[in-house]
Amino acid sequence: MRSRTYHDQSVCGPYGSQRTDCDRDTDAGSDTDVHGAQVATQIRTDTLLHSSLWVNIALAGLSILVFLYMARTVRANRARLIVGATLMIPLVSLSSYLGLVTGLTAGPIEMPAAHALAGEDVLSQWGRYLTWTLSTPMILLALGWLAEVDTADLFVVIAADIGMCLTGLAAALTTSSYAFRWAFYLVSTAFFVVVLYALLAKWPTNAEAAGTGDIFGTLRWLTVILWLGYPILWALGVEGFALVDSVGLTSWGYSLLDIGAKYLFAALLLRWVANNERTIAVGQRSGRGAIGDPVED
């Protein structure tokens, strides 16, 4: 499944003696297409894996339509910011799961020595990490605007969240060393601690002052509990200790977590925003640097 491409223009030229290497470049592109088709076929023939992806495609598409309807009457600026961030969650998920089911953002990687599946090719759904890099900041953005969090605090937490996702991707794709996989995992966990600290210790105070403490508390615990499931599943699944050595079962685990952490979260938030727009519009504070608020001199 490996291919080489040649990009040296001094080799790929119009002359007959240089034609062979240019043909290799074309063949490499063909090999990439074949590789993608093979991955898509592997996904399609694995019932557990295939169904875990299509369920989310269907739910993401349905959620987009339902959420647009729920938010149809929202007019206040801050409320619309929350709605916009929330709508991005299923939109990103739909794109992601389409990439996974077609094999575009998935592929086999060989597990390193000392791994339980050392030497075996395991299908990596690395596209999930790209999804989380885009969708989880939207969740935090919506929560931050709901709680009227200071812009600087919001930036730091979202930056930590992105770092968490990207180092998680590095952990999943590292094949040179089993120890380095876990090193990236620990760095990702450290970033996660920053996010948890904000959600559990800092932002609740902001939410109480903004008059959104009740709904923030519900969404905070939903987010914290479900997000904790991702690193636990990584450790137990094929990417970690392989105690669950089925890619299909691992994929279903991630998909179920996504359903709760994204669609359920978004539905609860949008319903509250639509019914409590005045609370968000008026707020309890101003001039604290939160996006959407006027800054007082």
UniProtKB/Swiss-Prot annotation:
Has UniProt tagged this entry with the keyword Cell membrane?
Answer: yes
Extracellular topology ranges: 1-45, 102-125, 175-177, 237-246
Which sequence positions carry the modification called N6-(retinylidene)lysine? Answer: 262
List the subcellular locations.
Cell membrane
Alphabetically list the UniProt keywords. Cell membrane, Chloride, Chromophore, Ion transport, Membrane, Photoreceptor protein, Receptor, Retinal protein, Sensory transduction, Transmembrane, Transmembrane helix, Transport
Q: Which family does it belong to?
A: Belongs to the archaeal/bacterial/fungal opsin family.
Q: What is this protein called?
A: Halorhodopsin
Its transmembrane ranges are 46-71, 78-101, 126-147, 151-174, 178-200, 213-236, 247-275
How does this protein sit in the membrane? Multi-pass membrane protein
**What is the gene called?**
hop
Q: What does this protein do?
A: Light-driven chloride pump.
Major subcellular site: membrane
In residue numbers, the region (Disordered) covers 1-31
Q: Please give the superkingdom of this protein's source.
A: Archaea
The Gene Ontology terms for molecular function here are: monoatomic ion channel activity; photoreceptor activity
Q: Which residues does the entry place in the Cytoplasmic compartment? A: 72-77, 148-150, 201-212, 276-297
- What's in the GO CC field? plasma membrane
Which BP terms in the Gene Ontology apply to this protein?
phototransduction
Q: Which residues form a coiled coil?
A: none
